[in-house]
C-alpha cells in the first residue's frame, strides 16, 4: 500500500482503511469530477499518463504511489485542508514551522471558500519519495 494513502488513513476514517481511501479517490477521478478550476480532470490526468483510463487503472493498484492529484481529490471529497511539509532538507519539525527551512504546500477543497466549510484539517510530511502523517 502506498505511504500517502496509509498516512491519510490516520486522519480520514473510512471503512476499509487506506485501500478504501485510494478507491474512493479513483472513483472521484473516474467520474471526471473537478480537481482544479479551469481544467478538465481528464486533461490533467493525460498530462501524467498515456491516457485518462491508464492513469486511473494504474492508481487503483496498491503498489502505485499517490501524489498531489490524489491529495487534492482527498481535499475535495472529505472537505479537508491538508498541509504537506517538504522535509527533504532534513528539517523534521512535525508541522511546527519556526524557521524558513520548512517549505509547505497547503491544499484546500475546491468548493470550500469559507473556513467553516472545512471538516478535516491535517498535515503530512513529504521527504521527496515518502509521506508520513504529522503527529503533533
Give the location of each predicted region.
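Papain-like cysteine protease catalytic cores
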Residues: 1-94, 101-104
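Structured partner-binding subdomains within large eukaryotic complex subunits
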Residues: 101-136
